[in-house]
Amino acid sequence: METLVVSKLNRGISTAKANRLLWLGRYAERVYLTLHMLRKHFDMMIDEDETAYVKFCTRMGIENKYSSADDFMKRKLFDSENPESVINMLERVKDNAILLREEIMTETLCYIELSIATMKNPAMQADGMAAMQQITDNILAFWGSIDERILNNEIRHTIKFGKYLESLELHMRFEYSLSRIKEIFDRLLHTIERDCYICEEITLLTMKEQLKLEKYPNKGLIYLVNSLANA
């Protein structure tokens, strides 16, 4: 996946903090949606095509370095040496959350720490995909805590901006319907209408026009998504 850096000083927060807030949102949403997509492909691997994980890797834009469906599921979920694993995504959320503890509150961070502890539990690892509902529930609670506990609008909106960027990219990669893409884009617009300094306005206008043309799926849209933050 392409990376994205926020380098413009925002009104009340530093460049470094803006980056951490945005990536906190992106990584948390990446965990949530990766698990969602994995469930669908896991069912396909059981019921239809045991090599469905190959298509998953292609759509995610990652290397297929797995020897089998079983190897894929184990390493994609629990392998701390695999930079694309869910456990590693959670560690990235945690790294940002620890540095932002004062902004997001300890209670919010606890949902991520609980998720990591769950992933490292041998009993949960033995259950595999069946145990991942707990992680999904924790991420939903994390987002609820973001909404409930963060009173600073600028901080909350920057995190949400990252969330919707990630949501747009992954839904595009997995070729969800144009109507679904537009729904997520509208949520992103709602966020940046409140704090428009977050967004690269020319790129935003280009993306609006592209969605109006309804030329989708379109790999160029993924590039635009990853160019939407001010650089």
Predicted features, each with a name:
Residues E2-A231:
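Alpha-helical transmembrane segments and their helix-helix packing motifs
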